[in-house]
A protein has these predicted regions:
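ATP-binding/phosphotransfer module of carbohydrate and carboxylate kinases, centering on a glycine-rich
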Residues: 1-93, 102-126, 172, 197-198, ...
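Small-residue (GG/TT-enriched) beta-loop-alpha framework at ligand/catalytic clefts
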Residues: 19-53, 183, 207-210, 224, ...
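Short, acidic Gly/Pro/Ser/Thr-rich loop/turn segments
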Residues: 75, 135-139, 215-218, 245
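Glycine-rich, histidine-containing beta strand-loop boundary motifs that form or position
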Residues: 79-81, 131-134, 186, 210-212, ...
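Glycine-rich phosphate-binding loop of actin/hexokinase-like ATP-binding domains
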Residues: 87-90, 152-158, 190-281, 285
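Short, internal active-site loops enriched in acidic
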Residues: 133-138, 188-191, 383-387, 419-421
Length: 431
């Protein structure tokens, strides 16, 4: 079996899937170069979107704010208020499925569904913190113009719309009020804002990283040449999922062509929760075509479909558990087949941890903070994949520490809390 594993590793190297091709420091250098170009507004795969939102100074005590969180899969609504110690209180929390996940919708149907989700809390505040987790061009009035819907959401006629204005219009159509003050932000900005709560220890600057259905990051920036030069510190969103990684190979490119939006968000498709499971199945099929696994197992793999990232995480942790969906979907019983599959999945998990760490590290480095004990960078981490995939998270954090602290002397700490996106959206909605 050792020979089989060695041959499998060689095949993954040839396909540019093996983690050895993805050195974290090299990746960070590439990302930082693209970030600089994006801030200048020229020739970058990273949007580097200014948000016109800065860190919170004072959070109003006791004032309610409505929060709407439109993510890659789930739609959440709630009412949030902060007590005198800065602690958030989340009330009336309701979770639904995002419109466009189960069936295609048009623009009106999409925003009507969002407005309907606020019916229970619409009369309790005139302020809305609207977290919309898709690429937007942010406006000085804190609305956001959608660049492109993604994460496999099926919604036609929505690209190019001002999402805050569309939400207000939908709420008026539903008889849910007229005068609304809406602040639009995405999930990474919301996570960063949550980390600015005064209850946290002192810090020099802020960044945030999201690894859920999708992937993104943001940080505080004051030097934005495309806005005309130095500005007051504000959150800049990388749109990191769109990074055009020069190290990406044909296996990833072939997988991208199977997705709903080929050519877009190609970095995200290498490791985010919405794609890691399907990518793993794609890699197993690639290996089956190369002659790996027993004949019976090759047949089962090539006929299989429907693996999710949660299935991959469970198999990676417990490969000998025959009750797991991964084992059942692939009808995998032979121990040699199990060992080969686990080795391939482990390569993808290690690569994912390096890709994730590269984005986190680049955002932290770009804050230009953390070089003395009083200026540590607070990095808020959020996302279902990051928190539930324990081994991926542990490896990512090890790579992050090795690069930032051991090699570069940058002090940072990771911030995590329940409902970070809801809390951060509430803070933004109150500013």
């Amino acid at each position: 079996m050792k020979a089989g594993i060695n041959e499998l590793m060689d095949t993954l190297r040839k396909g540019r899937v093996h983690y050895e091709d993805y050195d974290v420091a090299v990746l960070v250098g590439m990302i930082l170069k693209d970030m600089a170009l994006g801030l200048e507004g020229r020739g970058s795969s990273l949007e580097m979107i200014p948000t016109y939102v800065g860190p919170a100074q004072n959070i109003p005590v006791g004032e309610p704010v409505i929060v709407l969180d439109a993510g890659g899969t789930n739609l959440r609504s709630a009412l949030v208020r902060f007590d005198s110690s800065g602690e958030p209180h989340v009330e009336h929390l309701v979770k639904r499925t995002m419109p466009g996940v189960e069936a295609e919708v048009d623009n009106a149907g999409f925003f009507d569904a969002l407005a309907d989700s606020l019916s229970e809390v619409a009369g309790k505040s005139d302020r809305i913190g609207f977290c919309f987790s898709y690429a937007m061009s942010m406006q000085p009035d804190r609305d956001g113009r959608l660049i492109r819907i993604c994460k496999e959401i099926k919604a036609r006629g929505i690209d190019g719309r001002l999402v805050g204005a569309e939400l207000i219009e939908a709420m008026r159509r539903r008889g849910l009020g007229i005068d609304w003050k809406v602040t639009v932000l995405n999930d990474s900005v919301a996570a960063l804002m949550a980390g600015t709560q005064p209850s946290f220890r002192p810090r020099g600057s802020y960044a945030a990283f999201i690894l859920g259905t999708g992937m993104n990051a943001c940080y505080l920036e004051s030097n934005i040449p495309k806005l005309g030069g130095p500005v007051a510190p504000q959150v800049v969103v990388l749109e990191a999922g769109g990074f055009d990684c020069p190290l990406r190979g044909e296996v990833d490119a072939a997988f991208d062509r199977t997705t709903a939006d080929p050519g877009f968000y190609t970095y995200e498709k290498m490791f985010s929760g919405g794609y890691l499971g399907p990518l793993a199945l794609h890699v197993l099929k690639y290996l089956a075509h190369q002659g790996f696994f027993t004949f019976r197992q090759r047949t089962a793999i090539l006929a299989a479909g429907g693996l999710e990232t949660a299935d991959i995480a469970a198999f990676h942790a417990r490969p000998l558990d025959g009750t797991l969906p991964f084992r059942r979907v692939l009808a995998m019983e032979d121990e040699d087949d199990i060992e080969l599959a686990h080795a391939a999945i482990d390569v993808l998990v290690e690569r994912a941890s390096r890709l994730a760490a590269s984005v986190m590290a680049a955002a932290a480095i770009k804050t230009r903070s953390g070089y003395d004990i009083s200026s540590a960078v607070a990095i808020t981490v959020e996302g279902s994949t990051y928190h539930s995939f324990e081994d991926l998270r542990a490896r990512c954090e090890a790579h992050l520490y090795s690069l930032l602290t051991t090699r570069m002397g940058i002090r940072y700490y990771l911030v995590s809390m329940p409902d970070a996106v809801l809390v951060g959206s509430a803070i933004a909605g109150l500013l």
